[in-house]
Regions:
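Alpha-helical transmembrane segments
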Residues: 2-45, 80-111, 145-169, 190-377
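Membrane-interface helix-loop junction between the first two transmembrane segments
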Residues: 43-61
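Membrane-interfacial helix termini and the short, flexible loops that connect transmembrane helices
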Residues: 49, 118-127, 278-279
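Juxtamembrane helix-capping/reentrant segments at transmembrane boundaries
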Residues: 58-72, 126-137, 342, 347
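Short juxtamembrane and helix-loop transition motifs at transmembrane-helix boundaries
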Residues: 61-69, 101, 124, 178-186, ...
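Membrane-interfacial loop-to-helix junctions in multi-pass inner-membrane proteins
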Residues: 95-103, 122-137
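Alpha-helical transmembrane segments within multi-pass membrane transporters and channels
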Residues: 111-118
Length: 377
């Protein structure tokens, strides 16, 4: 909005507005706007949630130290969504389709999480949405994102080819080209791409959701992952850097740097109130929205295969649950004392703060390694 008004419309009359053309300037101010939105609106949201008695339910089989958190205001992801979307609308070029896809993902997955939280907290249904319903909505939202990207691929603004870490020239296409030209088979040509997009986005959304079990854990890791994605979006949209690093350059993709910057700022603002001991929890409305946004950005900048490194802690948390459930069903034995794995370390005697900070450190190491792979090819 400000880009359109102050740069495209008014900079001819007031040359200093030319600064709004610079992506780095708008990203920095999007981050700051998101941060201060979170800091200012946070107390209002916390107070309102308390007034409506929207508090967190703590399961009895969890660590006993967590029982004192019962009743802490939840559904704070509403604050995160506001702090992401408002700065993006203010500072991004709203003629850019990738920006709208990222915002759609945040809203769609946030709405799924909101419905889940609403049923659990307001209607006192312990499980919220059924697993089948939640997964169905997530898949539907991801398919819509995939279709939008296919449309952009037809117009030459997007590529369905994968960037494979550690390989310079290996870029397999997820569209079956010989079927794409067939009048009857062409819809099937895009099935591998659509399935892959669904896997990445739904997996990312649920992985962040599983990580959200300790004060500040998921949101701290989100700051790091979103920061790494901001670097990658900037490099992918910059002609010189993309050529030098042999990235798939898509000129319009750089505008997503502003969205990622807003995600970083909103996450830091939320962390101010979510740090141990937390004054507010994000709930599914926050974790699903953030995970969906992270997965969607990774798909759009062609770094889907790098996402397991960028969000390494999220992947480990999700794998710990999969392994625990699989082991118990197959062998009637548990691998961990409790899953997700952050609870395992709590039951080993680590304090909550120690688990959180060490997982943040691990997340930072994973993200730095992901960025170094750009040259390790």
């Amino acid at each position: 909005m400000l880009y359109w008004l102050l740069y495209l419309k008014l900079f001819h009359y007031f040359p200093p507005f030319r600064i709004f053309r610079y992506l780095t300037f708008r990203t920095a101010f999007a981050s700051l706007t998101a941060l201060f939105t979170g800091l200012i609106v946070g107390p209002i949201v916390i107070r309102r949630l308390r007034d409506f008695q929207i508090g967190q339910y703590i399961r009895e089989e969890g660590p006993q130290a967590h029982q004192k958190k019962a009743g802490t205001p939840t559904m704070g992801g509403l604050l995160i969504a506001i702090a992401i979307l408002v700065p993006t609308l203010l500072w991004a070029d709203l003629s850019n389709p990738f920006v709208w896809i990222a915002m759609f993902s945040t809203l769609a997955f946030g709405a799924i999480g909101f419905a889940d939280d609403y049923l659990k907290v307001v209607h006192h249904r312990n499980l919220g949405l059924t697993a089948r319903a939640k997964l169905g909505f997530q898949v539907a939202a991801s398919i819509m994102i995939a279709i939008a990207l296919i449309v952009l691929q037809h117009s030459g603004e997007y590529s369905t080819r994968l960037m494979v870490p550690f390989f310079k020239q290996f870029h397999p296409d997820l569209v079956i080209e010989r079927w794409a030209v067939h009048p009857q088979l062409w819809p099937l040509a895009f099935l591998p791409f659509v399935a892959f997009v669904v896997l990445v986005i739904v997996g990312s959304s649920n992985a962040v959701n599983l990580t959200d079990g300790l004060d500040g854990l998921a949101i701290g890791c989100t700051v790091i992952a979103a920061g790494a994605l901001a670097v990658l979006t900037y490099l992918s949209g910059h002609a010189t850097f993309a050529t030098y690093l042999e990235l798939q350059r898509m000129p319009q993709i750089g505008e997503l740097t502003i969205f990622c910057g807003a995600m970083v700022g909103s996450a830091i603002g939320f962390l101010w109130y979510n740090a141990h001991p937390a004054e507010i929890f994000m709930g599914d409305v926050g974790s699903l929205a953030l995970g969906g946004a992270i997965g969607t950005v990774a798909v759009m900048i062609k770094q889907e295969l790098l996402l397991p490194f960028i969000g390494g802690v999220f992947v480990i948390e999700a794998l710990s649950v999969i392994l625990q459930v699989g082991s118990y069903k197959l062998r009637k034995k548990r691998i961990f004392k409790m899953a997700p794995i952050h609870h395992h370390f709590e039951l080993l005697g680590w304090s909550e703060s120690k688990v959180i900070v060490r997982f943040w450190i691990a997340s930072l190491v994973f993200a730095l390694f992901a960025l170094t792979t750009l040259k390790l090819r």
